[in-house]
Amino acid sequence: TLANGLRAMDEVIEFLDYGSGDRFGHGLALGLNVDAYFKKKRYTIVSNVEEYFDDIVWMYHFIRAHIDRLEVKDFISGLSYTEYDILSMLEREFDRVKGYYNFDKLYTLYDFYEAYKLRGDDPEVYLEYNDGWNYDKVKFCCQTRINWHNPEHQSAANNPKARELYIKYHYCDKYKANHFKTFTGEASSIFIDAVKLVQFILRLKIYRMEIGIEGNPTSNRKISFINKYIDLPLLELNS
């Protein structure tokens, strides 16, 4: 899905320490016309449960983290829905899709996001050190196995529910089974606005971080649903 492609790019930045001078290949998701994309898909979302759930969790917190920027507020003013409408929709969708997991413990949207922020870590660390958890000790012993230099990492690793969820993500059969369950849903107008918003925020983030986008018109056309060169996503990035 388009949201999944945008999330994957943000994961590269956060988990692989991208910075000024680094480059993305193609980066089609950044420049695609969101309305045209969902029209082509007949306003249908097709994914697996796990990926769609991750998209919802990421979109919610990605928007929350950048909502106070003037450029973002200005962009939202041109959408059909307010930031409150969009965030409320994502909260409802989180509660709905969470039912697929059927956990016997209450995990919040924030717990899932904190677990998501541990994705760059070696999961074995959380099995080895979970009893008597001490972040400074783990950081000292496992510097090459955890993403400790990410400014949001410590709060996530110190959240016991986030650690539990991260262990489940890798080792729980019930959790992993959702990767093989097909999710089909409607791309509503408010969901489309949410995707437009995260696309804009990610473009702004990449621009401010001075990360480059490599593009080749012929290959871009072949790997996307675009038929005309004039509609290439690369051109949208230069607008």
Model regions and ranges:
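Glycine/threonine-rich flexible loop motifs
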Residues: 224
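Active-site-proximal loop/turn and secondary-structure-junction residues that shape catalytic pockets
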Residues: 2-4, 28-32, 217-221
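Histidine/acidic residue-rich metal-binding segments in metalloenzymes
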Residues: 1-23, 33-184, 193-212, 228-238
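Active-site-proximal segments of catalytic enzyme domains
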Residues: 187-191, 195, 218-219
